[in-house]
Amino acid sequence: MLLYIVIIVACIISKLVPNEYWAIHLFFIIMIFMVYMYKKLDIHQKYQFWNYTMSGLSGHNVQVTCKCY
């Protein structure tokens, strides 16, 4: 459901916003979607999410240790 809302909002913004600012708005839409998905995860999945994200961004194997009590 949220994905459809994000797509609809992206289409509306693409029609209203000048072309040179489209990348900035797309970045914020993606960030909002990532935060929403992150909040749905439990504590162990959150650490795995950041391990995968940081590994993808840096190109190196990154391990965030989970101190879950």
UniProtKB/Swiss-Prot annotation:
Membrane topology: Single-pass membrane protein
Keywords per UniProt: Glycoprotein, Host membrane, Membrane, Transmembrane, Transmembrane helix
Topological region Cytoplasmic: 1-15
Organism domain of life: Viruses
GO cellular component, one term: host cell membrane
Residues annotated as glycosylated: 51
Annotated TM spans: 16-36
Regions of this protein lying in the Extracellular compartment: 37-69
Protein's cellular compartments: Host membrane
Homology family: Belongs to the asfivirus X69R family.
Protein name stated in the entry: Uncharacterized membrane protein X69R
Native source species: African swine fever virus (isolate Tick/Malawi/Lil 20-1/1983)
Source taxonomy: Viruses, Varidnaviria, Bamfordvirae, Nucleocytoviricota, Pokkesviricetes
